[in-house]
């Protein structure tokens, strides 16, 4: 129950602009993926592959450059290799691993789906405190528990879970001073 309360508390601190930004965050990401690549799936796959520990603006820039040049670069080496495989024609779902990355991919491909991307910010929001680099790993059990908390909170707030995650992410970034 505490997870739901923490998520709801962050949502309640959202400005109108942050709510609007969050509501349209994944549809905008979908449009970016469609614009930078031959298919939305390929674009979303490269964006998702490069996403771990990557600021959003840099992530988009690197994905855009990767498709323009045919060469992925700039991220963690294993993630760059996954992005390159997708650029070279691999199915993103055959390449991408981990609940966070695969869900992020799915949310970009289908911004109105039911997946919740539980990244380090979503985790911190749910537990009610910033962990920096000291947070425990997000294994399958924790991922499922936190995803369920976002789904339940979203039901109470009248928004889709993917929208709630994006809205709270937008608020959290402002509150912790991340652009």
Where are these regions (language model features)?
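HhH-family (HhH-GPD) DNA N-glycosylase catalytic core used in base-excision repair
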Residues: 1-179
């Amino acid at each position: 129950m505490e997870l739901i309360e923490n998520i709801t508390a962050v949502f309640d601190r959202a400005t109108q602009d942050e709510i609007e930004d969050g509501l349209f965050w994944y549809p905008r990401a979908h449009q970016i993926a469609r614009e930078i690549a031959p298919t939305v799936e390929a674009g979303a796959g490269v964006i998702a592959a490069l996403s771990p520990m990557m600021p959003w603006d840099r992530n988009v820039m690197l994905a855009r450059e990767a498709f323009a040049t045919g060469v992925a670069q700039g991220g963690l080496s294993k993630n760059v290799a996954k992005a390159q495989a997708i650029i070279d024609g691999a199915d993103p779902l055959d390449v991408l691993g981990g609940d966070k990355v695969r869900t992020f991919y799915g949310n970009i491909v289908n911004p109105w789906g039911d997946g919740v991307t539980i990244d380090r910010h979503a985790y911190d929001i749910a537990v009610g405190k910033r962990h920096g680099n000291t947070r425990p790993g997000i294994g399958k059990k924790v991922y499922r528990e936190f995803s369920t908390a976002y789904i339940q909170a979203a039901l109470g707030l009248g928004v889709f879970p993917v929208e709630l995650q994006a809205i709270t992410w937008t608020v959290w970034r402002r509150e912790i001073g991340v652009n």
